[in-house]
A protein has these predicted regions:
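A structural motif at transmembrane helix-loop-helix junctions in multipass membrane proteins
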Residues: 82, 88, 146-192
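A hydrophobic alpha-helix feature that marks transmembrane segments and, especially
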Residues: 68-90, 110, 175
């Protein structure tokens, strides 16, 4: 079924429903019905939320994705140069010959990226303080947000594990990539993996008092929205912080262990697994082939799904 025929079918169905309503109303009118049918059981919508809650909810929907975007782009600039850039320039091997332990080098590079992410969060939280709390700039008449200094501190605390998680993944990505261009190719899928769960707060009916608090990144997105409307469920706020914090700790440990391998710090395309071959290559290639099979399955299901 082509797009043209699908659109034609939709428009025809709408016209048939409209015609049926007109015929039904004409029968009522012909039989002497005293009022117009559309005036029976009318429903009116009334917004009971305050202007502060409306403004906070609207700002809370966009705050997490916006800060995440800035953290990813800002941290990526430093991460790509931390390992991929040094590989390309040939300076990483020189750094590894110093007396500094490899774990210390990885930790220092990770802290550098974390510093960029924290700086992004702090600057934007200060912007909220200046514009919303101190009232330096007059807001539009229909837009109001009521935040206290404690709310801003709570927002900053919620963003801390997200910053560590992003920094760890970006540094790990830089370790896998051998050049700037290869890093840029890998960056876009990672960007989507972080962006999609951060939009959980935009889903209708999504409440922090559910299993979403245990989902990393998504729990932070919903928790930030709750704080912006000044609804504090401390237990679930702690769960959202802890779930993302646990993911950040795991990612940091994984980055430190992974970047200790010779294959990721050298420009050589071969390591022991490449030389041995066979089952030794399975852990490295299984995800790649699984991804290819998943893409093929998705394409086939989209193409032939209606006929199966």
């Amino acid at each position: 079924q082509s797009d043209f025929s699908r659109n034609a079918s939709t428009r025809l169905g709408s016209r048939i429903v409209e015609l049926r309503s007109q015929l039904r109303d004409s029968v009522y009118t012909a039989r002497g019905f005293p009022v117009a049918p559309e005036l029976i059981a009318t429903v009116e919508t009334e917004n009971t939320a305050s202007a502060e809650k409306e403004g906070g909810a609207l700002l809370g929907l966009a705050l997490t994705p916006f800060l995440l975007l800035l953290m990813l782009t800002g941290g990526s600039i430093m991460a790509v140069d931390a390992i991929s850039g040094e590989k390309e320039r040939g300076t990483l091997e020189t750094l590894l010959t110093t007396s500094a332990a490899r774990s210390d080098i990885v930790t220092a590079k990770l802290l550098g990226i974390v510093t960029v992410g924290i700086a992004v969060a702090v600057v934007n939280i200060l912007n909220l303080l200046v514009y919303l709390v101190l009232g330096v700039v007059d807001l539009p008449e229909n837009f109001a947000v009521a935040l206290s200094a404690l709310d801003l501190v709570l927002l900053l605390i919620l963003f801390l594990p997200l910053t560590v998680l992003i920094s760890s993944v970006l540094l790990l990505l830089s370790g896998y990539a051998k050049t700037y261009k290869e890093y840029q190719i890998y960056f876009f899928p990672v960007f989507l993996v972080f962006l999609v769960p951060s939009l959980a707060g935009t889903l209708p009916g999504m409440d922090l008092r559910s299993a979403i608090a245990l989902v990393p990144i998504a729990g932070i997105g919903v928790a930030v929205r709750e704080v912006m409307v000044r609804e504090y469920d401390w237990l679930f706020l702690f769960l959202a912080f802890s779930s993302t914090g646990a993911a950040a700790w795991w990612a940091a440990r994984l980055t430190e262990r992974t970047l200790s391998t010779e294959h990721l710090i050298s420009q050589s395309d071969l390591d022991e697994a490449d030389l041995v071959g066979g089952p030794a290559l399975f852990p490295r290639r299984v995800l790649r082939w699984f991804g290819v099979m998943w893409v093929i399955f998705l394409i086939v299901s989209l193409w032939f799904g209606e006929d199966l």
